[in-house]
Amino acid sequence: PDTISIHKYLQFLKKNEINNVIIEASSHGLDQDRLHHINFKAAIFTNFSQDHLDYHKNMTSYLNAKLILFKKILKKNSRIISDKNINEYPVLKKIAKNRGLNLIEIVKIIKKIKITSLNEMSEFKIKNLAMAIEAAKLCGLKEKKIFKSLKKIKDVDGRFELARQFSNNIKVFIDYAHTPDALLKVLQSLER
């Protein structure tokens, strides 16, 4: 949505005493300055892979658009939540240091998720869940309560979805991966 619509939605939520909102900051929206006047407590950087090149034309332009949130929009002492195992982590670390942002790494929470072992979970789902948990904690939710509620979470259809399991333990999964990186992550999860 355009900037005016975003602010109308946020104002409506505020009037209805909704104090924490999660917004997907698309590279298009960042590039078009649609999110510049929003006060974010934190931002999550999940990954970076070949996508949206019809708009951005090249990977450098695409990455620069995604980094606008971290380089220009987040205010001092805001948080960046990410995975130290992604290629862009050193860039995020440098931005955090230069801008006085706090970088939250997800290794410990990933271990806790794996111990709780939720159904068939791919590595990318575990990482995304870990980042969401860290964001929820920043909104004041207690970790213990978050982990209790995980049993109620329904998977997104078509994302490493177990479609069928045969008696000989062969499993069929559906995933709508549409980028080379997403397909690779699905295949790596199946390998495990």
Where do the protein language model's features map onto the residues?
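Acidic, Mg2+-coordinating active-site environments of NTP-dependent enzymes
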Residues: 14-25, 29-31, 39-172
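Conserved phosphate/oxyanion-binding catalytic-loop motifs
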Residues: 175
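AMP-binding/adenylate-forming catalytic core of the ANL superfamily
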Residues: 178-192
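Walker A (P-loop) phosphate-binding motif
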Residues: 1
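Short amphipathic alpha-helices and their capping/turn segments at secondary-structure boundaries
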Residues: 29-35, 187-189
